[in-house]
């Protein structure tokens, strides 16, 4: 049976980088037929039409149709998978509260449209930043959709962390397992080497603590800014790749721990209801579970408190703005 995949901000750089990979079967598998729905703001609809033309011109066997709209109700109607990529970027002189409010005007109505029109088995990935709190807004405005269906992307942070560690140790990325990121998708995030393994060895035992704390953690957290500085534009292909990884493993399963920002049920002391990145096991079928009993020592706890504190501040700000109850 065909699946409907809705992509917002479809005419943007990440949208352009991801749509062809979805249509080729890299996200939902090589046998899954699909229909794409592209949601864009009115001024970008013509660009989205051009992308749709190219998608058709690729003659992907799995792609049944491409629909383009500026109406969230149409875009999310019958959607099985929603990739919320479109977001308001921070502009010069903008305070964080302004950014949260601007994005609230996007993610509040999208949450409602998902609630009212998406398929019963919908799964949602928020990519647009600030991703954790945008996810919180959408989730809180979709009260009829189980909150386990909503997630925000921290897989790009994980992929960056894995690659940097592999380069440091001179190993392949496939030798690094269970390396996850906790907390917010921001420079406060905490990449966890205590529970990660490299060729079966504890990752934290293979590096100097000084390097871990003062070089590795800050560089993972600020990698996005480093890329903007180098190429004059934000990460697009790597963000698209991480979104593919996230949804593929969520739907089809994975044999390693991975990072997903999901609603907390109080695990590891993270306040109930906050959308925080956690380590997750992914059995497939759009399910996830947060494992118990992972090592969270004093160092990790101190880092967690900082990033969770930031998430609480963002939550309180959007609550004050009336974007969540």
UniProtKB/Swiss-Prot annotation:
GO biological processes: malate metabolic process; tricarboxylic acid cycle
Keyword Oxidoreductase: yes
PROSITE patterns: MDH
Pfam families: Ldh_1_C, Ldh_1_N
Keywords, sorted A to Z: NAD, Oxidoreductase, Tricarboxylic acid cycle
Highest taxon of source: Bacteria
InterPro entries named among the record's database cross-references: L-lactate/malate_DH (IPR001557), Lactate/malate_DH_C (IPR022383), Lactate/malate_DH_N (IPR001236), Lactate_DH/Glyco_Ohase_4_C (IPR015955), Malate_DH_AS (IPR001252), Malate_DH_type2 (IPR010945), NAD(P)-bd_dom_sf (IPR036291)
CDD domains: MDH_chloroplast-like
Residue numbers annotated as active site: 185 (proton acceptor)
EC number: 1.1.1.37
Catalyzed reactions: (S)-malate + NAD(+) = oxaloacetate + NADH + H(+)
A GO term, aspect molecular function: L-malate dehydrogenase (NAD+) activity
Binding positions (NAD(+)): 9-15, 103, 110, 127-129
SUPFAM superfamilies, per database record: LDH C-terminal domain-like, NAD(P)-binding Rossmann-fold domains
UniProt-annotated binding residues for substrate: 90, 96, 129, 160
Role: Catalyzes the reversible oxidation of malate to oxaloacetate.
Family designation: Belongs to the LDH/MDH superfamily. MDH type 2 family.
NCBIfam families for the chain: MalateDH-SF1 (TIGR01759), PRK05442.1 (NF003916)
Identification of the protein by name: Malate dehydrogenase
Protein species of origin: Rubrobacter xylanophilus (strain DSM 9941 / JCM 11954 / NBRC 16129 / PRD-1)
Native organism taxonomy: Bacteria, Bacillati, Actinomycetota, Rubrobacteria, Rubrobacterales
Gene responsible for this protein: mdh
């Amino acid at each position: 049976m065909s699946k409907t995949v809705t992509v917002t901000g479809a005419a943007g750089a990440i949208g352009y980088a991801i749509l062809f990979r979805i249509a080729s079967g890299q996200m939902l598998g090589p046998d899954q037929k699909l229909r794409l729905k592209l949601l864009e703001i009115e001024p970008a609809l013509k660009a989205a039409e051009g992308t749709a033309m190219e998608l058709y011109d690729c003659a992907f066997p799995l792609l049944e149709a491409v629909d383009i709209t500026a109406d969230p109700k149409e875009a999310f109607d019958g959607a099985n998978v929603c990739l919320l990529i479109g977001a308001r970027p921070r502009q010069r002189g903008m305070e964080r509260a302004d950014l949260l409010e601007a994005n609230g005007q996007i993610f509040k109505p999208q949450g409602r449209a998902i609630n009212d029109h998406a398929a019963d088995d919908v799964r949602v990935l928020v990519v647009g930043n600030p991703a954790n709190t945008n996810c919180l807004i959408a989730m809180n405005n979709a009260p009829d959709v189980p909150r386990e269906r909503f997630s925000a992307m921290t897989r790009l942070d994980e992929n960056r962390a894995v690659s940097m560690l592999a380069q440091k140790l001179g190993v392949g990325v496939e030798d690094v397992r269970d390396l996850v990121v906790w907390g917010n998708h921001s420079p406060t995030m905490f990449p966890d080497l205590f529970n990660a393994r490299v060729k079966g060895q504890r990752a934290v035992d293979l590096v100097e603590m000084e390097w871990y704390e003062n070089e590795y953690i800050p560089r993972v957290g600020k990698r996005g800014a480093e890329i903007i500085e180098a190429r004059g534009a934000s990460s697009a292909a790597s963000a698209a790749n991480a979104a593919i990884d996230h949804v593929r493993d969520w739907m089809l399963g994975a044999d390693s721990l991975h990072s997903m920002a999901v609603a907390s049920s109080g695990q590891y002391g993270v306040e109930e209801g906050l959308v925080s990145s956690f380590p997750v096991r992914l059995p497939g079928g759009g399910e996830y579970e947060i494992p118990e009993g992972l090592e969270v020592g004093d160092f990790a706890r101190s880092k967690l408190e900082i990033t969770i504190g930031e998430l609480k501040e963002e939550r309180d700000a959007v609550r004050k703005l009336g974007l969540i109850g």
